[in-house]
Every structure is written in structure tokens, then in C-alpha cells.
């Protein structure tokens, strides 16, 4: 693979990762389709995906640094509150409660979960995750009991964590599962999305660092430029995607995202079957 070709592939996959990682559309489904079409598969590709995920995580840290510092008791002066946004009064206990179910289940069934990573299971997860988004929009309370992060209860945080377990099914979408769960628990669409992003930092960071440690032997000096391009691209695109997404969900429901998931599921079927 030529240097320019590999850098182009890195940029394309970085864009795909950045756009889809935190949207409820399944980054896994998109990555396996695009990776297959580009002919970029195997151990190096898996290591590359782990590295560019770190770029996406960094985007969340940059976007929510104030709230993240607040979790450990460090508070900074806040700008004037905008309508519909949370005040960021979240505690570390909320995050821990949101993490526990998926961490426990992930450790206990690690090998089983890894065995589910194939196109057919991803396709089914895309469909079921889309149905959950529709259910969340149809069944959510008319008036959210927790319009902002500061209104969330420990019980709601734990239940969102239980819904996050669905994301252990490859292709389901971690953000799709947690946001849907939050809405069904009476958290507003916006606050559920914010909590999903904050919850992603420790969850994804832990999983990504572990995967990177296991995949370190596949990383060579020759791959560094490609990995760097993918990392930076994923970071920049994820930053834009998160900002756009948070503005968009103030105006539209998640139904369009559900329909899009069905389209991606059909694409997986066409490409792999």
C-alpha cells in the first residue's frame, strides 16, 4: 500500500469514525462496511480503529472539559446558561452508576461478546437499535422528569447504565442505547445525550486502552503517519459532529436516525451477503 493511498484511507476512516462514534447510528456498522469496501481489514486495521477512537474520545474531553472537571470537584466560572442546556451539576457517583452494569457484564462475557463481532450480528443490532430509538420517542414521558443533567437521579443514571449493556452487542450503538434508555427513564433528549457523551469518556477510554495494549504488537513505525492522520481527522470531525448533533436534537426527534440505521443494515446485507 503506497504512502498516499494509506493516508487517504486513514483520512476516510477518520471521517467515518468521527461522524458516527457519538451519533446513535453505530460506528461499528459503518466501519466494517467502509473498511471492507476499501480493502482495509485484518490486525493492522483493528489496531487503527482503536487509535482513531482515541481521537473521538479526545473530542468529548475538549467539548465537556468543564463538566468533567466538575465531577472531581474542580469548578470553573460558567458562562450564561442557554435555554435547554444543563447546568452541569453532575456527580462522579452518577457516572459510576452508569458504568457498573456494562463493565461487569463486559468482563464476565468478554469472549462471548467478541464472538458476536460479525456482519450478520451487526446487521441485526442496527435494526433492533433503530426500533429502540423509535420506542424511546413514542414511549417517553410528555414532560421529562429530568430536563437537565442537574435533575438526574442516581436511579436514572443506573438504569441508563443497564441500557448501555445493549451496546455490548456489536452494531447496537452505545450512544443509541444510552440516549434511548435515558429518554425512557424520563430524562430529556438533550440531557440524555449529554450524559451519554460524558459516560463515553471513562467507558471508551478504558476499553480502548485495553484493546490498544493487546494490539500493540501490530503497530509499526511505518504505520505512525497513517495512524496520526486518522487520529487527527477523527478528533476534528467528532468535535464538529458533537456540536452539530447537540444543536440538531433540539429541533428534531431520533426517528430520522432510526430510519438511517435501517438503511445501513440493508447496506451491510448487500455488501456482505
Swiss-Prot record:
It is found in: Cell inner membrane. One of its GO terms (molecular function) is undecaprenyl-diphosphatase activity. One of its GO terms (biological process) is cell wall organization. Its main location: membrane. InterPro entries: UppP. Belongs to the UppP family. This is Undecaprenyl-diphosphatase. Keywords: Antibiotic resistance, Cell inner membrane, Cell membrane, Cell shape, Cell wall biogenesis/degradation, Hydrolase, Membrane, Peptidoglycan synthesis, Transmembrane, Transmembrane helix. The keyword Membrane applies. It catalyses: di-trans,octa-cis-undecaprenyl diphosphate + H2O = di-trans,octa-cis-undecaprenyl phosphate + phosphate + H(+). One of its GO terms (cellular component) is plasma membrane. The lineage of its organism: Bacteria, Pseudomonadati, Pseudomonadota, Gammaproteobacteria, Enterobacterales. The gene is uppP. Its EC number is 3.6.1.27.
Amino acid at each position: 500500500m503506497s504512502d498516499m493511498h494509506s493516508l487517504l484511507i486513514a483520512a476516510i476512516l477518520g471521517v467515518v469514525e468521527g461522524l458516527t462514534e457519538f451519533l446513535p447510528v453505530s460506528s461499528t456498522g459503518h466501519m466494517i462496511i467502509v473498511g471492507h469496501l476499501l480493502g482495509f481489514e485484518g490486525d493492522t486495521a483493528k489496531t487503527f480503529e482503536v487509535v482513531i477512537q482515541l481521537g473521538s474520545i479526545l473530542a468529548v474531553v475538549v467539548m465537556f472539559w468543564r463538566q468533567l472537571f466538575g465531577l472531581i470537584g474542580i469548578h470553573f466560572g460558567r458562562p450564561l446558561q442557554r435555554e435547554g442546556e444543563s447546568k452541569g451539576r453532575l456527580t462522579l457517583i452518577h457516572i459510576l452508576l452508569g458504568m457498573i452494569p456494562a463493565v461487569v457484564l463486559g468482563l464476565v462475557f468478554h469472549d462471548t461478546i467478541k464472538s458476536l463481532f460479525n456482519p450478520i450480528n451487526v446487521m441485526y443490532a442496527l435494526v433492533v437499535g433503530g426500533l429502540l430509538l423509535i420506542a424511546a420517542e413514542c414511549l417517553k414521558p410528555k414532560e421529562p422528569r429530568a430536563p437537565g443533567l442537574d435533575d438526574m437521579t442516581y436511579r436514572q443514571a443506573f438504569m441508563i447504565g443497564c441500557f448501555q449493556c445493549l451496546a455490548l452487542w456489536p452494531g447496537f450503538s452505545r450512544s443509541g442505547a444510552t440516549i434511548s434508555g435515558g429518554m425512557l427513564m424520563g430524562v430529556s433528549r438533550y440531557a440524555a445525550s449529554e450524559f451519554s457523551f460524558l459516560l463515553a469518556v471513562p467507558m471508551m477510554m478504558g476499553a480502548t486502552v485495553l484493546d490498544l495494549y493487546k494490539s500493540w504488537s501490530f503497530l509499526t513505525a511505518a504505520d505512525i503517519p497513517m495512524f496520526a492522520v486518522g487520529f487527527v481527522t477523527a478528533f476534528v470531525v467528532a468535535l464538529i459532529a458533537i456540536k452539530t448533533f447537540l444543536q440538531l436534537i433540539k429541533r428534531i426527534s431520533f426517528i430520522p436516525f432510526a430510519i438511517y440505521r435501517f438503511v445501513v443494515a440493508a447496506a451491510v446485507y448487500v455488501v456482505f451477503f
